Amino acid sequence: VLGPHLSDETEFTVELHPLDATTDTLKRLKDGGVNRISMGVQSLDDAILSKMGRGYTFHDAERAFYRIREHFENAGIDLIVGYPGEECALSPRHARLAKWGLAHCSVYSLILEEKSILANQVRRKVSPPPPDDDTTLNRLSIVAAFLKEIGLNRYEIANYAAPQRECRHNFAVWRGEDYVGLGEGAHGRIGRLRFQDFGMDSMKQEEVSPDADMKERTLFRLRT
């Protein structure tokens, strides 16, 4: 629907769960004008994926990404470092990422939200605690060095990209440009209007003051 109305300069990204990356879905996304895919892998460790309740294995994610690459050149993944039970920064499976043809990779440290299920499990000692901050920072550095080795350069605190594959949405956020987010949990900005989509036809909108807008832009620019 949107495809014919988008310019060559438009970045149209869809975030996919590995189990949703079917051939039929990918064809429809391509036909609809989508030109970039981000797949939430989160971990390459099957035991941790199970604890996360993700519903797939590393091999499922690998096969899904190869399907994505059959339809999209501009495709990347998200990873999380510091999940409880994580024993090291890199495993032999990380070496396989070199063959995936990644255009982009986002690497986030785990944030243990106070009211989350995981935080409750840690408090009840059902789950081990996450690694301490120093360990997590060290592992992030190791992952960053690995990504550089496979051709992904760091261009922002948590983001790495192949040449000319930096995420335009990230740049739009930093520069205070307008962007639109669709789907549950998505955020958008048009001028001084901010909105968040909660799904089920529920959306929060807020118009911020010029001063708040300027402060927001300044803080986001620090991420580079």
What are these regions (language model features)?
Residues V1-T224:
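C-terminal scaffold of the Radical SAM
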